């Protein structure tokens, strides 16, 4: 063996490096830097990781906001998260500074394992993201919704009335079919005539699994401590296999829907009056080849997901609210009956004449947001806000639940009270760009990441609310003893866990308001079937 001569100076130097490194880890990693927004006390190395709940993080974040303010910081190992629970700060940072707050933080689970980075929700703020958004904006902008898409939306809402009439016990499935059929038809010319349609059932299964995987605590903090990639996943609930499985099923479903669309597009027996999104996108793709096949599949997938879940979950929460607050239901039906008779159901042309319906829609978004914590943003440069240093690379979490349950803005926030929005006569897109004091809710996101389907979604929900209230009375179901069955509307126990929140299945009594309205529903559904043929061929 060749002897190694190490000088005393080298030994001292190496020892000093080790000592300094250990001291750095102990006294710096996990600690909040001076000038950062305040937050809960930290521990060396891990920061606040040990304090993060595995479920219902938005409740804890709201509790901390009451103590530490509208913006506070959490230390996650070497990283920093900023939690915003203040509407004015949202406007200052997320809207007015959107050029530096529109990126996404690293996510090994959602970016690498599940979507390979091609899903618009997790995609970084780059040129590909801008190209995809441009296509979506052009197809779903307000003028297109007004001129073209609203006809289909009205027809699908009419079928939903028929479904509530015929099988009221399946009301939670009818709202899902309704919203999925609209977006699937507009994207692919493929309707969802029943909830049992394979593409719809498969999609909702995937979304439920993805939501569960993305719940904080369901996977190890691999973005903070990459060593978790190399520890046997069986110690953490096979998290890699679960996430990868969701990604494979996503890709398989979305690619198959593109393939089936191409087959139908080449079938001479199918003649559609209205072009779908993919008629336009694939025609452009033939010229430019600007997207990969995987990107194309996920361009469809992200819109299917967004268009299928939010509207359905909001309509389900609306039904809950009508059962539990019958006075709200009574006031809404009185407004409808003053404007519309029994010989027709409400249409989008009635929007201005039914402001209370708009208020109900806004209050439902506020009362039970589908995403109580919006998908995280990432700060791309240092920024100063109200005297605080917000560091480059920080993860930004918008605490939608906390903002929309702020008692200083919404007294008795657990009460469903549409009168909060009696002066809000416009739709959500108008308030998203207005003064922060007028913002109605944050269901569609903020800044440059605001949902590109916002105009479609607003019309989905408004039509659903208006037609269902015109047609039906919603009451508590009764048990075998003849007593009303109380509904669990507790956001902690009556709703699903995960990134997306929806009411757990519940029973209620749905009764058509008159025989004349029943006949009108049947008559309007016959007309709706003609509309479906125009979109599907």
Swiss-Prot record:
Residues the record lists as binding heme: 451
Induction summary: Expression is down-regulated by the cluster-specific transcription factor AOL_s00215g275. Expression is also down-regulated by the HOG1-MAPK pathway downstream transcription factor MSN2.
Residues annotated as glycosylated: 126
Functional pathway: Secondary metabolite biosynthesis; terpenoid biosynthesis
Keyword list, A-Z: Glycoprotein, Heme, Iron, Membrane, Metal-binding, Monooxygenase, Oxidoreductase, Transmembrane, Transmembrane helix
Needed cofactors: heme
E.C. number(s) listed in UniProt: 1.-.-.-
GO biological process: terpenoid biosynthetic process
Gene3D superfamilies membership: Cytochrome P450
Disulfide cross-links: none
Subcellular location: Membrane
Molecular functions (GO terms): heme binding; iron ion binding; monooxygenase activity; oxidoreductase activity, acting on paired donors, with incorporation or reduction of molecular oxygen
Disruption phenotype: Abolishes the production of arthrobotrisins A to D and arthrosporol A, and accumulates m-cresol. Lead to altered growth rates and causes significant decreases in the spore formation and germination. Shows significantly increased ammonia levels in fungal mycelia.
Example of a GO cellular component annotation carried by this entry: membrane
Parts of the chain that traverse the membrane: 9-29
Main subcellular location: membrane
Organism domain of life: Eukaryota
Function: Cytochrome P450 monooxygenase; part of the gene cluster that mediates the biosynthesis of sesquiterpenyl epoxy-cyclohexenoids (SECs) such as anthrobotrisins and arthrosporols, metabolites that possess a novel hybrid carbon skeleton consisting of a polyketide-derived epoxycyclohexenol combined with a terpenoid-derived monocyclic sesquiterpenol substructure (PKS-PTS hybrid). The SEC pathway plays an important role for fungal soil colonization via decreasing fungal nematode-capturing ability.
Similarity section: Belongs to the cytochrome P450 family.
Protein name as annotated: Cytochrome P450 monooxygenase AOL_s00215g282
Higher taxonomy: Eukaryota, Fungi, Dikarya, Ascomycota, Pezizomycotina
